[in-house]
């Protein structure tokens, strides 16, 4: 994990997990019945936020904005795809995550509408009159189009719509290095967008 996120400076080389063997075994026994690899980013993110709330709440006078308040403000702001979103005092990244998810949902809805439109075009009455071989060819072409659309939702594809949202539109800073790292990890757990989060006092007068 340290090597994978080395460029993001999430962990120091000296960081170690300090846990007793008995505690580790108890955690494994409790969690081994769940397949987290098949769990959605939303579920992982909610679980991580629950952990954050219990661990950091009130630490150094910092409190987290309730998710209902975040959702309300994001809905009022109504961020659009391609717009730059910045939180100069991002804390655990709640507002950045809310904005990321809001725009991501719009992208997903748009792509789903595009899929329906394309499928309707390919599955018209004309399709029913094709020979079996011609239908197979049409199905193959349809699958290629859908596969290309799916790359738009890959956050690692920097040229895709979700990739551009993750790498070009989401930015945040926090004066507390621990909170900056926490915001990065929180965004990773919610499906990414962490690359624009940095340790910096965003409220300083740089002029």
Where are these regions (language model features)?
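Short acidic-aromatic active-site loops that bind/stabilize oxyanions
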Residues: 37, 59-63, 172-173
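Class I SAM-dependent transferase core
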Residues: 43-68, 74-76
């Amino acid at each position: 994990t340290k090597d994978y996120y080395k460029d993001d400076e999430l962990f120091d080389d000296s960081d170690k997990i300090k846990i007793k063997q008995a505690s580790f075994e108890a955690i494994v026994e409790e969690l081994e019945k769940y397949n987290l690899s098949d769990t959605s980013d939303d579920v992982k993110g909610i679980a991580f936020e629950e952990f954050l709330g219990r661990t950091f709440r009130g630490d150094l006078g910092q409190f987290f904005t309730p998710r209902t308040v975040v959702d309300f403000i994001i809905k009022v702001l109504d961020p659009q795809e391609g717009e730059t979103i910045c939180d100069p005092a991002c804390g655990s990244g709640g507002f950045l995550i809310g904005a990321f998810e809001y725009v991501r949902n719009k992208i997903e809805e748009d792509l789903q509408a595009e899929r329906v439109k394309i499928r309707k075009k390919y599955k018209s009455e004309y399709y029913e009159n094709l020979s079996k071989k011609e239908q197979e060819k049409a199905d193959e072409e349809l699958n290629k189009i859908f596969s290309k659309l799916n790359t738009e939702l890959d956050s690692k594809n920097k040229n895709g719509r979700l990739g551009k949202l993750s790498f070009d539109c989401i930015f945040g800073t926090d004066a507390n290095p621990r909170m900056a790292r926490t915001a990065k990890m929180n965004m990773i757990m919610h499906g990414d967008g962490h690359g624009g989060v940095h340790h910096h006092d965003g409220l300083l007068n740089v002029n």
